[in-house]
C-alpha cells in the first residue's frame, strides 16, 4: 500500500493484506476438543456393595458408620438402633477388640478401611491393618457409655457405687455421721478407747492383728504375666536381646522375625514361609549365645583377662563382643554386628562402608 502523503515511493509499515482466493469459503474457528455429542450425564447413585442403581431416593440408605450409600438388602437396622451396612455391622459386633479383629479376614479389613477412605498401600502385615481399624473406631453411643463394667467379687462396694444413679453431685448426709462439734469430740474419744482396748488384747494374747486394706496385692501369676507382656512393646522394634529362651521364637510374628534378622544384618530374601524365618532366627540366637559363652568362659579361666589368641577374635571397636560381621565392599572383618552398623568407613582401609553382613561361624 502506498502512503497517502504523496502516493509515491513512500511506504507505510503495515503489511499488505493478501485477498482470499476466489471460491474459498471462510471457516469459523473450531475447538479441537469440542464434541458435537451431548455431554454424559453424572453417575447415578448406586449401592456401594452390590452396585445396584437406586430407582428412587427412598431405596437409598446411608450407613451411619462409613457414610456410604447402600440398598435395603446390603444394610440392616436392629431395633431402634442406627442403620449400618453389613460390613460395619460385623465390625461393631467385635466391639473393636484386638483379639476379635485378628480373627477376621484380611480382605474384610481392607474393605472396611477403604469404606472409611483410609489407604492400605503401605500395610504389609495383618497387624498393621488391625492397628488402623482400631484408630478408626466409631463414636460410642450413650447407652454404651452409661453401662457400668462388671467388677470381680472382691469389690462389692465399688460395684454398688457404679450401679447407683447419680442424681446429684452433692451426696446425702448419712445418719451415722456426727453433725455437731460435741459429737465429733465424743466419737474421737470412743475411737481412742477402742484402740487402747485392742492394744491390751494383742499384748495379752501375743497375736498380731492385721487390718484389711482396700488395695489388693496381685498374685505371682499375674505379676509374671504382666512382665511377659511388657517384654515386647508394640511401638518398639523387636530385638535379639528380648529373647531369653528358644521357645520365645515361636511366639514371634513374621514382622518381628524380619526385624530381628534385619537388625543383625541377616538376609532373609527368598524366605516364603514363617518356619524359614524361624530357622534363621534360631541359628542366629544359638550362634550369638555360643560366642558369648566362649568369651565369658575364657575370661573366667584366665581371671578376667582375655588370652592373646582369643583377643584376635574380639571386636576392635568395643573389645567386648566377638567379630561376627563383614564390611562391604572392602571385606574386612574387624567389628561385631552392633559396631558394624555404626561404621561409616572401615577402620582399617578407610573405605566407605556400603553395608554390613552378619557371618555365621561354623
Swiss-Prot record:
Stored CDD domains: FYVE_CARP2 (cd15770), RING-HC_CARP2 (cd16707)
Database matches in PROSITE patterns: ZF_RING_2 (PS50089)
Modification note: Autoubiquitinated.
UniProt biased composition (Polar residues): 24-37
Zinc finger (FYVE-type): 41-93
Pfam families in the record: FYVE_CARP1-2, RNF34L-like_3rd, SAP_RNF34_RFFL, zf-C3HC4_3
Pathway of action: Protein modification; protein ubiquitination
Region: Disordered, residue numbers: 17-37, 162-183
One example GO MF annotation: ubiquitin protein ligase activity
A GO biological process held by the record: protein K48-linked ubiquitination
Principal location class: cytoplasm
InterPro entries for this protein: CARP1_2_FYVE, CARP2_FYVE, RING-FYVE_E3_ubiquitin-ligase, RNF34L-like_HeH, SAP_dom_sf, Znf_FYVE_PHD, Znf_RING, Znf_RING/FYVE/PHD
Subunit text: Interacts with CASP8 and CASP10. Interacts with RIPK1 (via protein kinase domain); involved in RIPK1 ubiquitination. Interacts with PRR5L. Interacts (via RING-type zinc finger) with p53/TP53; involved in p53/TP53 ubiquitination. Interacts (via RING-type zinc finger) with MDM2; the interaction stabilizes MDM2.
PANTHER family per record: CASPASE REGULATOR, RING FINGER DOMAIN-CONTAINING (PTHR14879), E3 UBIQUITIN-PROTEIN LIGASE RIFIFYLIN (PTHR14879:SF2)
Free-text domain note: The RING-type zinc finger is required for the ubiquitination of target proteins. The FYVE-type zinc finger domain is required for localization to the recycling endosome membranes and the function in endocytic recycling.
Protein name: E3 ubiquitin-protein ligase rififylin
Organism expressing this protein natively: Rattus norvegicus
